[in-house]
């Protein structure tokens, strides 16, 4: 696991933070070739081969669910599983499998870079092949999975094949009170990164005792798959949201990077505007890495807010003031698209909440799409985030997961 980030090769692009404008990003959303099998025995064993003939296959929209596009039916359950519980086993005779195939092209400009395949969420388990070669497996429907496909792709045309299983042993931990639907339900894309890069970062923001000055603690992980022991400059910059982009902090740290390094920054920022649900003031944190000649390798940016949350004398305080939580539970659900929701749908939900004086939302009962958290940050909503763990169907006897 790592933080949500996307690298850019210019400072301007990093401030825009629109990855669709990057030449090193390619969406794989849209039409995929698709074959439905009611159980694993009925699926084609060789569908992942590069030269497999899928001309007679149907098409399916990704992201999406096969139950909402003409194959099988959705199942709604709360405190039961859609199969007799016998962990870790799942039924074999009616465990549907969706086989997906899609072609994509790697441009010449990606040569020499590391290439990654990103799945935002797949329910419930899946295998991945590139050009007929097995790349990996993942399960856990509500968190992203990434695969380094550098050694599997070629410049020019390539093929990705995916086998998605409706049930897996992970289904025992995904017993949420909601519709049970299957498939690639979040975005899919590929992207290319420099051999030397910012691999992760973790920013903690707060306020001092006066609630006027900001405190930021930052840990940056850098990775070097290129030339070792070369000096690199890591720059941290914080600007406000005004038209002039006033600088509040600017610092550079020069270090050599063997295979991986971690760098820490701690600073106090004077006279910041604090973040609350009523006034969601945000700042732009920009991280960049450059080589010894000053050439920018990549830059990333992230919106951050300064707030201090405490519990004192039974009161929940935000920036020293007691607040009243007026919250709602929210499932990721669209009446047409199911859990394959769009940004427009998210914004519409948030606007309805704000219009009705709602200031908090619970992600019942799993992590949401990354964009949801960014929008809550921008519009001003307190978020109660939940892990993708719920096992209602096993809770009333000695073999329950609670034991």
Regions found by a protein language model. Give the residues of each.
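Low-complexity, Pro/Ser/Thr- and charge-rich linker/hinge segments at domain boundaries
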Residues: 185-202, 307-321
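Short acidic/polar inter-strand loop motif in beta-rich domains
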Residues: 166-172, 290-297
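Short, small-residue-biased leader/transition segments that mark boundaries at the very start
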Residues: 4-11
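Accessory beta-strand-rich segments of carbohydrate-active enzymes
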Residues: 18-19, 33-37, 65-68, 73, ...
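Beta-strand-rich binding/interaction modules
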Residues: 128-130, 213-255, 263-265, 285
């Amino acid at each position: 696991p790592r933080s949500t980030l996307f690298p850019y090769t210019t400072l301007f692009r990093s401030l825009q933070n629109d990855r669709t404008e990057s030449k090193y990003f390619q969406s794989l959303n849209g039409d995929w070739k698709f074959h439905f099998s009611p159980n694993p025995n009925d699926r084609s064993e060789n569908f992942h081969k590069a030269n497999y003939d899928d001309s007679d296959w149907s098409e399916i929209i990704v992201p999406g669910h096969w139950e909402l596009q003409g194959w099988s039916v959705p199942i709604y359950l709360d405190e039961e599983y859609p199969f007799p519980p016998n962990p870790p086993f799942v039924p074999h005779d009616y465990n549907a499998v969706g086989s997906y195939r899609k072609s994509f092209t790697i441009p010449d400009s990606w040569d020499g870079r590391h290439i990654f395949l990103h799945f935002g969420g797949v329910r419930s388990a899946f295998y991945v092949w590139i050009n007929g070669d097995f790349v990996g497996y993942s399960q856990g429907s509500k968190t992203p999975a990434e695969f380094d496909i550098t050694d599997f792709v070629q410049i020019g045309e390539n093929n990705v094949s995916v086998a998605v299983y409706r049930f897996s042993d992970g289904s025992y931990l995904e017993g949420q009170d909601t519709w049970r639907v299957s498939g690639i339900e979040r975005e899919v894309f590929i992207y290319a990164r420099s051999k030397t890069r910012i691999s992760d970062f973790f920013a903690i923001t707060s306020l001092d005792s006066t609630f006027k000055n900001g405190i930021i603690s930052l840990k940056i992980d850098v990775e070097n798959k290129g030339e070792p022991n070369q000096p690199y400059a890591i720059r941290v910059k914080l600007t406000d949201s005004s038209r002039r982009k006033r600088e509040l902090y600017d610092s550079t740290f020069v270090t050599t990077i063997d295979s991986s390094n971690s760098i820490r920054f701690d600073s106090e920022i004077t006279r910041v505007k604090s973040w609350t649900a009523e006034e969601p003031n945000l700042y732009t944190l920009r991280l960049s890495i450059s080589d010894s000649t000053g050439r920018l390798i990549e830059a990333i940016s992230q919106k951050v807010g300064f707030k201090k949350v405490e519990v004192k004398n039974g009161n929940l305080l935000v920036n020293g003031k007691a607040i009243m939580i007026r919250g709602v539970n929210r499932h990721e659900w669209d009446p047409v698209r199911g859990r394959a929701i769009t940004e427009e749908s998210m914004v519409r939900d948030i606007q309805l909440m704000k219009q009705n004086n709602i200031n908090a939302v619970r992600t019942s009962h799993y992590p949401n799409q990354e964009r949801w958290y960014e929008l809550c940050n921008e519009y001003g909503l307190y978020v109660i985030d939940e892990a993708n763990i719920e096992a209602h169907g096993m809770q009333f006897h000695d073999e329950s997961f609670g034991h």
